[in-house]
C-alpha cells in the first residue's frame, strides 16, 4: 500500500483577516514577536507574514527603533 505524500499546511498571514491586529510602531508587544532574541527582524518565511505586511512590519520596527521604543541590538 502506497503512503500518501506528506501535505504541509499553508501558513496564513497573521495580519490579514477580519480580527487581525493593525501594525503600529507604538505597539511594542506586537512588534517584539517579530524580532529575534538578538534584535533582528525575523524573515517572513518563518513568521508566515505576507510580503506586503512584512514591509509594513519592517518599517514599523525601524521606526520604533529610531524612537528608542525597541533596541537595535540585544547583548
Curated annotation (Swiss-Prot):
Source organism: Cereibacter sphaeroides (strain ATCC 17023 / DSM 158 / JCM 6121 / CCUG 31486 / LMG 2827 / NBRC 12203 / NCIMB 8253 / ATH 2.4.1.) (Rhodobacter sphaeroides)
GO molecular function, one term: structural constituent of ribosome
PANTHER family, A to Z: 30S RIBOSOMAL PROTEIN S18, SMALL RIBOSOMAL SUBUNIT PROTEIN BS18M
Gene: rpsR
The UniProt record lists the keyword RNA-binding: yes
UniProt name for this protein: Small ribosomal subunit protein bS18
Pfam families: Ribosomal_S18 (PF01084)
InterPro entries given in the database record: Ribosomal_bS18 (IPR001648), Ribosomal_bS18_CS (IPR018275), Ribosomal_bS18_sf (IPR036870)
Family: Belongs to the bacterial ribosomal protein bS18 family.
Keywords: Ribonucleoprotein, Ribosomal protein, RNA-binding, rRNA-binding
Gene3D superfamilies for the chain: Ribosomal protein S18 (4.10.640.10)
NCBIfam families: S18
Quaternary structure and partners: Part of the 30S ribosomal subunit. Forms a tight heterodimer with protein bS6.
Amino acid at each position: 500500500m502506497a503512503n500518501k505524500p506528506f501535505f504541509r499546511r499553508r501558513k496564513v498571514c497573521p495580519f490579514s483577516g477580519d480580527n487581525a491586529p493593525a501594525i503600529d510602531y507604538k505597539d511594542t508587544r506586537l512588534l517584539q514577536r517579530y524580532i529575534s532574541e538578538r534584535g533582528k527582524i525575523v524573515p517572513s518565511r518563518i513568521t508566515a507574514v505576507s510580503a506586503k505586511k512584512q514591509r509594513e512590519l519592517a518599517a514599523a520596527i525601524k521606526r520604533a527603533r529610531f524612537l528608542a521604543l525597541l533596541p537595535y541590538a540585544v547583548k
